[in-house]
Design a protein with these regions (language model features):
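Bacterial carbohydrate/catabolite-sensing allosteric modules
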Residues: 2-4, 50, 91-96, 147-154, ...
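Short gly/ser/thr-rich secondary-structure transition/capping motifs
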Residues: 50-56, 110, 136, 281
């Protein structure tokens, strides 16, 4: 071998010779198909490891019809919520012998379409996706993937327009419970940050279902939970207490500031995401108000900072890793041929009561 020349990669034949078996036996062992005894499998794997043999995944996929890869599409891979989901997917997939490819979309439907096409081009066996589509919006890119034989499992979102599995949390139930706890603590004016993004906010509670139909499933479910709590306690719906702006921390600060400037301002805020919490707290600070002495706050998603804040933040804790694990298990069931009807798997969230809510 000339100086600087890379050594030749070990071959299937060399693995077979070292293990004392035929090439076909090595191919079956490393390819994960056919019947191989435990003793033979151990010899083949030991020889492959000793030689540093790396299997040709393309050749394997041509033999088995699978790449043993799951594609995952989420809005923001840096968001702690989606990072938790990704962790759950990865752990479950790895335990079942699957690799994971992840693409972020920034909650952009055009980017989502491109992401799905990219994953299909890479021959993934199935896709787990937190879709950016509204709950009643057509999703031809996902329907096309299903027609092409690629299982789809929705995570954190559900859609009325496609017949496939969805793994979600109990957004509506836990929001009603949380807002009801505020009401039972004496609060009658409760701000809601955020509602679904829309240029035509609800003027009364009867408009809410129309807004929800076009919204992300999770956003819509939380708004429905909020209105459920108001109805349950015979409180009026006030559109001025619901933010429908872009979902950024700055917009949350602006929206809550507007609520605090009302003649009858809220005494509590229910914030549906981490940026909504920090934006709400910033609005209070700008006006010299304190949580919970002046305004109580409940947030969504637990984190280390929520517990060490002063006061510690009362939050809805979503089981992010459980969401991801359940979604991965569901798509693997589909990949491996389990034939059943589409189902919604609902994972329970928990209201963690800390120090950011005061009695009125």
């Amino acid at each position: 071998m000339a100086r600087g020349e890379a050594p030749a990669a070990p071959t299937l034949t060399e693995v077979a010779e070292m293990a004392g078996v035929g090439r076909a036996t090595v191919a079956r062992t490393l390819g994960g198909y056919g019947s191989v005894s435990a003793k033979t499998r151990e010899k083949v794997l030991a020889a492959a490891e000793r030689l540093g043999y790396a299997q040709n995944q393309l050749a394997k996929s041509m033999t088995t019809g699978r790449t043993n890869t799951i594609g995952v599409v989420v809005a923001d891979v840096g968001n702690p919520f989606f990072a938790g989901i990704l962790s759950g997917v990865a752990v479950t997939a790895r335990a079942r012998g699957y690799d994971v490819l992840v693409i972020g979309t920034d909650e952009d439907l055009a980017e989502e379409r491109r992401a799905v096409e990219t994953l299909l081009g890479k021959q993934v066996d199935g896709i787990v996706i937190a879709s950016a589509a509204g709950r009643s919006q057509p999703v031809p890119h996902l329907e096309s993937a299903l027609r092409r034989g690629c299982p789809i499992v929705l995570v954190d979102r559900d859609l009325d327009t496609i017949d496939t599995d969805a793994v979600v949390t109990d957004n509506r139930v836990v929001t009603e419970h949380s807002v009801s706890r505020l009401i039972e603590s004496g609060h009658r004016r409760i701000g809601f940050v955020w509602g679904p993004v829309t240029s035509q906010p609800a003027t009364d509670v009867d408009d809410v279902p129309k807004i929800v139909a076009d919204a992300l499933w999770s956003d819509g479910e939380r708004l429905l939970g909020y209105t459920d709590a108001l109805r349950r306690h015979d409180l009026p719906f006030d559109t001025a207490l619901v933010s429908h702006s872009l979902q950024t921390e700055a917009q949350a600060t602006r929206a809550v500031g507007g609520m605090l400037d009302l003649a009858d301002p809220p005494t509590a805020i229910f914030a549906t995401e981490a940026d909504a919490v920090t934006g709400s707290l910033r609005a209070l600070r700008k006006r010299g108000l304190r949580c919970p002495d002046d305004v109580s706050v409940i947030g969504f998603d637990d984190s280390s900072w929520a517990e060490v804040m002063d006061p510690p933040m009362t939050v809805v804790a979503q089981p992010m890793q459980a969401l991801g694990a359940s979604a991965a298990a569901a798509v693997i069931e589909r990949i491996e041929g389990q034939d059943r009807g589409a189902r919604r798997i609902e994972v329970e969230s928990t209201l963690i009561w800390r120090g950011s809510v005061a009695e009125r």
